[in-house]
Every structure is written in structure tokens, then in C-alpha cells.
């Protein structure tokens, strides 16, 4: 959700190319482009440290101030250096309050399944259609006490108010399984027990 803490002052940039981008990043800024709602793309720079903190939250919505004019923008794409993990460029989509957008929301697993089993997350995110200024940080799946073979599908949990599932409702998100190593140990124990009985 956009609020006072999401306000970011941007500067319009007119220099492009790899050399210009390096200079921008060396100055503690991030090159970005903001577009949407039929407007021409605007190339800007943003303060790297402030934006880096805001991007700790998935699907961040920023309140961008460009020469005194503010626009809400959803972070659509983050390009990072694959080694240093430094943000190299951002794509920002202009949104309006009350507007619905489709976003990938992280799936978070809580609780401990039945002893000897583990929760295997098949899909790390789920696509929802939500208001741009009311995007949930995550969807929680509670697996407390769940037994082997239990499956969780997209339709199996309540969505936040105002959110609509934008996936196949039968999409498999998570499985409760017995780890292969543990299963092999159990099978080996059964074989040994059978051998002991046969020897008696």
C-alpha cells in the first residue's frame, strides 16, 4: 500500500547507455522507466538506498514525485547484477487508486506437518487480481499437523478481502510428503525386521 513512507523523489534523466547507467549507479541512484495509462514512458533516476529498502516488500507500490507531480507506480520488473545483486534498473507501471492489477504474491508456509513429513512447496507465488494500493505481502498456508499425501490447491484457502484468484483454482501449490531418505530408511528397517523373523 502506498503511504508516506513510500514517497520517492525522482529526477528525469536524459543520458542513456551503459556508461550513463554506470555513472548514475555510482552516484547512488537507480535508472528507471515509468509508463502506463497511455502516457509516454519517462526515464528517471531514483535514490538507490531508499528504493532498495522499499523493495524488500514484494509488489511495492511507490509514490513517485517527478518535478512536483506525483504518480503511484507498481514495481513491475527489477534487474539486478547476477553476482553483486545490485539493482541495475527498474520498470515502473503507473497505477491509480482503486485500480485492479494482477500480481504474483509470495506463498508462505507456516506450522509443522505430521512427524516425519515435510511441506514441499511446488509454486512459490500465486497470481491474484487486487487493488493496486492493497496488495497483500504474502499468502499463508498453515500445514500444522498435516499428514502425508495432503495437497493444497489454489482454491483451498481464503483470499484477502477484495482479492480474486487469477490462476486455475486447481493449481497445486504444496504437497505434504515423506522425504526420500526417510522412506528408504523405513523400507530398510522393514526388510531387516523380516529377515530377523525368517532367521528365528
From Swiss-Prot:
Part of the 50S ribosomal subunit; part of the 5S rRNA/L5/L18/L25 subcomplex. Contacts the 5S rRNA. Binds to the 5S rRNA independently of L5 and L18. InterPro entries: Rbsml_bL25/Gln-tRNA_synth_N, Ribosomal_bL25/Gln-tRNA_synth, Ribosomal_bL25_b-dom, Ribosomal_bL25_C, Ribosomal_bL25_long, Ribosomal_L25_dom, Ribosomal_uL5_bac-type. PANTHER family: RIBOSOMAL PROTEIN L25/GLN-TRNA SYNTHETASE, ANTI-CODON-BINDING DOMAIN-CONTAINING PROTEIN (PTHR33284), RIBOSOMAL PROTEIN L25_GLN-TRNA SYNTHETASE, ANTI-CODON-BINDING DOMAIN-CONTAINING PROTEIN (PTHR33284:SF1). Keywords: Ribonucleoprotein, Ribosomal protein, RNA-binding, rRNA-binding. GO terms for biological process: translation. Pfam families: Ribosomal_L25p (PF01386), Ribosomal_TL5_C (PF14693). It comes from Leifsonia xyli subsp. xyli (strain CTCB07). It comes from the Bacteria. This is Large ribosomal subunit protein bL25. This is one of the proteins that binds to the 5S RNA in the ribosome where it forms part of the central protuberance. Gene3D superfamilies: Ribosomal protein L25, beta domain (2.170.120.20), Ribosomal Protein L25, Chain P (2.40.240.10). One of its GO terms (molecular function) is structural constituent of ribosome. One of its GO terms (cellular component) is cytosolic large ribosomal subunit. Belongs to the bacterial ribosomal protein bL25 family. CTC subfamily. The keyword DNA-binding does not apply.
Amino acid at each position: 500500500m502506498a503511504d508516506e513512507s513510500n514517497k520517492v523523489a525522482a529526477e528525469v534523466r536524459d543520458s542513456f547507455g551503459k556508461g550513463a547507467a554506470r555513472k548514475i549507479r555510482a552516484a547512488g541512484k537507480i535508472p528507471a522507466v515509468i509508463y502506463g495509462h497511455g502516457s509516454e514512458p519517462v526515464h528517471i533516476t531514483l535514490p538507490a538506498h531508499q528504493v532498495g529498502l522499499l523493495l524488500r516488500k514484494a509488489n511495492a507500490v511507490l509514490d513517485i514525485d517527478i518535478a512536483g507531480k506525483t504518480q503511484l507506480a507498481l514495481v513491475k520488473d527489477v534487474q539486478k547484477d547476477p553476482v553483486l545483486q545490485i539493482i541495475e534498473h527498474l520498470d515502473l507501471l503507473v497505477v491509480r487508486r482503486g485500480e485492479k492489477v494482477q500480481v504474483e504474491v509470495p506463498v508462505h508456509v507456516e506450522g509443522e506437518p505430521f512427524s516425519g513429513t515435510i511441506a514441499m512447496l511446488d509454486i512459490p507465488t500465486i497470481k491474484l487480481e487486487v487493488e493496486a494500493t492493497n496488495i497483500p505481502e504474502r499468502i499463508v498456508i498453515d500445514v500444522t499437523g498435516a499428514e502425508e499425501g495432503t495437497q493444497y490447491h489454489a482454491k483451498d484457502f481464503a483470499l484477502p478481502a477484495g482479492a480474486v484468484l487469477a490462476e486455475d483454482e486447481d493449481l497445486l501449490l504444496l504437497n505434504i510428503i515423506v522425504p526420500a531418505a526417510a522412506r528408504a530408511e523405513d523400507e530398510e528397517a522393514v526388510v531387516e525386521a523380516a529377515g530377523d523373523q525368517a532367521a528365528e
